[in-house]
């Protein structure tokens, strides 16, 4: 029954203290919150912490959610972004790279290694971008939000978000070239 209710209906029920209404929200959106936090932080452990903290904030602030101003997912993304950026600004916050398993057969293993190298170049370049540019790319390209949704999550006008995204893409391309050159020398 609860699984069929909209996110907004579930938040309203959670705001009135219904803990059972909160579980489907977590089930639906925890993975997305973790992915967004990891795209910003580059650290799986911290991303898990941020996602959990975000849902704690959602629970504590459910009564302040206004479905007329934004969808639940946009509100959640804004909370995750704010928490991740705050965490990034803390001294000693460094991205931690993850080690993936390499496939056993040689052609697949080689393709996997090449793909890993390319991903590492993009990841390194991404973490060299200013945090707002990184957030714009993460929301639009990794999370698949529309320009309007991403703009709302970042508290920007659509036009300002589009401009930020264009600058972010240009900067990312430049950083990818620079990282590739550094690795080749």
Sequence positions of predicted segments:
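Short, charged helix-capping/linker segments at alpha-helix termini
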Residues: 1-2, 15-24, 34-53, 158, ...
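C-terminal edge and immediately downstream basic/flexible tail or linker adjoining helix-turn-helix-like DNA-binding
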Residues: 2-3, 115, 124, 152-155, ...
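Internal acidic/polar
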Residues: 4-7, 86, 92-119, 146
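Sigma70-family region 2
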Residues: 15-16, 42-43, 55-69, 90-91
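Amphipathic, Lys/Arg- and hydrophobic-enriched alpha-helical face
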Residues: 26-44, 61, 77, 126, ...
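Structural recognition of an alpha-helix C-terminal capping motif at a helix-to-coil junction
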Residues: 49-56, 70-82
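Arg/Lys-rich amphipathic alpha helix in sigma70-family domain 2
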Residues: 60-67, 78-97, 115, 176-178
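Helix-turn-helix DNA-binding module
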Residues: 123-135, 139, 143-160
